[in-house]
Curated annotation (Swiss-Prot):
InterPro entries: Ribosomal_L11_MeTrfase_PrmA, Ribosomal_PrmA_MeTrfase, SAM-dependent_MTases_sf. Keywords: Cytoplasm, Methyltransferase, S-adenosyl-L-methionine, Transferase. It comes from Ralstonia pickettii (strain 12J). GO terms for biological process: methylation. Transmembrane segments: none annotated. S-adenosyl-L-methionine binds at residues 152, 173, 195, 234. The gene is prmA. The lineage of its organism: Bacteria, Pseudomonadati, Pseudomonadota, Betaproteobacteria, Burkholderiales. This is Ribosomal protein L11 methyltransferase. NCBIfam families: prmA (TIGR00406). It is found in: Cytoplasm.
Amino acid sequence: MTYRECVLEVARDDAEALSEALFDLGALSVSVEDADADTPEEQPLFGEPGHEPTRLAWNRSRVVALLAEDADPALLVAAAANEINLSPLPAYTVREVEEQDWVRVTQSQFEPIHIGEHIWVVPSWHDAPEPDAVVLELDPGLAFGTGSHPTTRLCMEWLEQHVHPGERTLDYGCGSGILAIVAKKLGAGETVGVDIDPNAVEASRYNAERNHVEATFALPDDAPEGTFDLVVANILSNPLKLMAAMLCARVRPGGRLILSGVLERQAEEVAAAYASTIPLTVWRARDGWVCLHGVKPT
């Protein structure tokens, strides 16, 4: 069976209404995506702590409608636009989509990810590419990160170059646990991952177990106390600014702090939030994102 995929780029205020109209008029499925995803202009889905939540959709939204083979995309788009009084008609593209074994197709699209010198993130259906590699087995599709985003890669590259054996390490905002797990595999000592999302904590525990890593993952109120030799936080700029005092307090004198999830244009203001306690500099930049690092004075 063949389907048709119709992709429309629309303004934020029209995305939800157009999606509902397309679905009401016979689309098999409709999704809304950030047209600027994976660029420096991407927007957090639900906003950042301390900022107004994102509205119903992104500034530039992409509406993707899956249609039956015999559907007429032009008529459907025109009818949907008319239903919500949208003028002029949005630009759209259409492509044919063959029915396939989607599990196999998805797996074929994800190859092992090489990060730094010897780190590989490997889906469960692949073997490790190098016998001496530092391998993390993580499957794509996790909501909490698999190493493909520039900020995650930057943090992993930093860890590969700078982790010292036995260092007590904290991954704050651990998501999938990927940074805590790689730190442990690189020789870190006691390793703790913290996240405000219980699902992320559970995902991290699962990933640590499948990677044969001993680490503690917990919600903030349940996390081990004390200071750490190494604190890494790959979150977003505004929560990083809001949590500056707390994160600095978690770093022991002489310990190191690594931050990412920060756009190049945000680096100066994020560093300013930490300047009174830990001076931060840009370690490396990639694709509009930066990794900041610094040492807490003794």
